[in-house]
Amino acid sequence: METDPVPTPSAISWNIQFHPLTTGVAISLIVTFVLIVCSALISGSEVAYFSLSPSEKHKISGRSNKKSFYINKNLESPEQLLATILVANNFVNVGIVILSSFTVDSIVDFTNEPILGFIVQVVIISFVILLFGEIIPKVYSTHHAMKFARLIAMPLHYTIKVLRPVNSILIYSTSFLN
């Protein structure tokens, strides 16, 4: 009698335990979702702002509404804009990783299956961040740069103001190295 050396997925018995969903975990899931949306907006803004054509920039400068004002202000210092986008996106992505790790640890006990725990916590979470926080927003904003720039103009303007001290250090260190 011959046996199959490779087990089928239904024959694999994972020794993991699930814990009940608590209020803290539910809040963590909601905040993680909000942070993924923030990551998407920040990532999309990078492509949107830096792919605006000169004619679109000229069109914006001729308008006198609030969104056009904020877009023009954001574009005044491309170094500050890029530094803000990079720093903010890193902060948000670190928050996503920390919260999702907490959430997974609170829901599932991978003590007896550390490799499966690694796959869930690192591979799947990285995939979610890349797909929903980076790739999809950048593809969308490539095709709708003006619309995306208008959507994120005011929040990005205030994010630039908040992160200016950190950005200044980043910009100074970059110019010092050059």
Residue spans for each PLM region:
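Membrane-embedded alpha-helical segments of inner-membrane proteins
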Residues: M1-N178
